[in-house]
Amino acid sequence: MNLSDYILEFLRKKRVHNIFTITGGAICFLMDAFSRNNKLKYTSVAHEQAAAMMADSYSRFGPNFSATMVTSGPGATNLLTGIACSWFDSIPSLHICGQVNRYELSSFDKSTKKVRQVGFQETDIVSMAKPITKFAYQLKNENEIRYVL
């Protein structure tokens, strides 16, 4: 089982039934995993903020919490208003954002380069999301996924 399949299977076991998403290069492996998992449904939306608001509403009024999956850069930053909405009203939700390849990260190999100097659409979304979430984290390697989820 690869990491993308593991994430979707974890969400299924937590009774997440619908994930709101916009596809993008930084989450293409997660989107591919949907084709191998017929127990989860995803809803493709026109804007990431809509995905976050839909996840909030689904969690607020539905039987289970919901999630979003978006790509890096503007895809991630567009979630912030919806994340804040959930935060202010204590509505549970999970937001998974893609990021540039590990070797393109400004933090890779103790690089002295700043964010956005190496990777396409690299964004420090964790720093932006921390004030409006209970937990915001960027995986450093795939072995952390069990703890992070």
Positions of predicted regions on the chain:
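N-terminal alpha/beta PP-like core and its mobile active-site loop of ThDP/TPP-dependent enzymes
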Residues: 1-149
